[in-house]
């Protein structure tokens, strides 16, 4: 007896279903992972979304919750499993998994614990999606992007850290707020480490091509009576403030990740401040990943913009590299 489906539908092609062309995987379904997932779905970037985590009940619950909203989305397939086979044929894998810093724990110890987790995650990703681009979001993101590069064996252009893409967005928002314009009309970069040693590139900040430094030569320095330097401090402190208020950050990093994913999936060639290997640039001679303005397209991170930095900015960038290397050089089992 024919089923309802067989009575309803006449099949004209017996071929297997086509493989997804823009499958996105999110590793980790915590607050950040789910913000990334929702942002990717709302921007309609994936024809399949896969979620992976070790917490089976939460994983299944998040998958079902998203599937129940399928009517309002344009991603036809949403799947989840703790087994990484569910990630097969991913175009981009976003890694948000890892452990948080415990009270009194050293940064090196935190990184080493995350290295041990990545030693399981990364080979599984590469096994099932050998041609994928990996976007690392877990913190400390620059060091874990280096760890991912080492563990994956993939070329540098396919290993990207979310880096200071969000820091730069915060920077532009705060400057725009002071000037009374929209953040998209205010241009500027935070480079270097995603963290306390990040570098505010005041020499490049502009609105409609008008350099703020040309209007106020001491902008962003200790001599600046208007205290624009506080804007960078606010950028550095903002995550801590949000965490203090709500317990975690998730929405802004989710939006930031979706913007990066969009540049890749749509082959846009947009410039993002993301974490990449910087050895040989700006006098840095160690294998560290730092954020520089990078061109992202369908092949991944294809080039770096050679920004004309001032001497003090280059010095800060080098110091940022030294900060990361001081942690990185003592990592084991890579």
Swiss-Prot record:
Q: In which pathway does it act?
A: Fermentation; pyruvate fermentation to lactate; (S)-lactate from pyruvate: step 1/1
**Catalytic residues identified in the record:** 194 (proton acceptor)
Q: Which GO terms describe its biological process?
A: lactate metabolic process; pyruvate metabolic process
- Identify the keywords attached in UniProt to this record, alphabetized: Cytoplasm, NAD, Oxidoreductase
Q: Which reaction equations make up its catalytic activity?
A: (S)-lactate + NAD(+) = pyruvate + NADH + H(+)
Question: What Gene3D superfamilies does the record point to?
Answer: Lactate dehydrogenase/glycoside hydrolase, family 4, C-terminal (3.90.110.10), NAD(P)-binding Rossmann-like Domain (3.40.50.720)
Q: What is its main location?
A: cytoplasm
Q: Name one GO cellular component term.
A: mitochondrion
The family line of this record is: Belongs to the LDH/MDH superfamily. LDH family.
Q: What is the annotated quaternary arrangement, including any partners? A: Homotetramer.
Q: What is this protein called?
A: L-lactate dehydrogenase A chain
Native species of this protein? Xenopus laevis (African clawed frog)
Q: Which gene encodes it?
A: ldha
């Amino acid at each position: 007896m024919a089923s309802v489906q067989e009575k309803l539908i006449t099949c004209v092609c017996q071929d297997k279903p086509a493989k997804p062309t823009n499958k996105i995987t999110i590793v980790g379904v915590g607050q950040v992972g789910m913000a990334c997932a929702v942002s990717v779905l709302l921007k309609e970037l994936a024809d399949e979304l896969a979620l992976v985590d070790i917490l089976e009940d939460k994983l299944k619950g998040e998958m079902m919750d998203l599937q129940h909203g399928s009517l309002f989305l344009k991603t036809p397939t949403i799947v989840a499993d703790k087994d990484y086979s569910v990630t097969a044929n991913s175009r981009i894998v976003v890694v948000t998994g890892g452990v948080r810093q415990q009270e009194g724990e050293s940064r090196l110890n935190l990184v080493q614990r995350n290295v041990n987790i990545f030693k399981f995650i990364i080979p599984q990703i590469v096994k099932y999606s050998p041609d994928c681009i990996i976007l690392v979001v877990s913190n400390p993101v620059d060091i874990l992007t280096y760890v991912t590069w080492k563990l994956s064996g993939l070329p540098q252009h396919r290993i990207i850290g979310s880096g200071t893409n969000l820091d730069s967005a915060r920077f532009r928002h705060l400057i725009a707020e002071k000037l009374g314009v929209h953040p998209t009309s205010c241009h500027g970069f935070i480079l270097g480490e995603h963290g306390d040693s990040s570098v505010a590139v005041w020499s490049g900040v502009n609105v409609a091509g008008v350099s703020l430094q040309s209007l106020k030569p001491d902008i962003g320095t200790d001599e600046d009576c208007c205290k624009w330097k506080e804007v960078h401090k606010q950028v550095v402190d903002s995550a801590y403030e949000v965490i203090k208020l709500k317990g975690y950050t998730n929405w802004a990093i989710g939006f930031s990740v979706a913007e990066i994913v969009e540049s890749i999936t749509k082959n846009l060639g947009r410039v993002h401040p993301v974490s990449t290997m910087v050895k040989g640039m700006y006098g840095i001679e160690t294998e560290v990943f730092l954020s520089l303005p990078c061109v992202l397209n369908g092949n991944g991170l294809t080039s770096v913009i050679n920004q004309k930095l001032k001497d003090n900015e280059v010095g800060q960038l080098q110091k940022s590299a030294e900060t990361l290397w001081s942690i990185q050089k003592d990592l084991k089992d890579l």
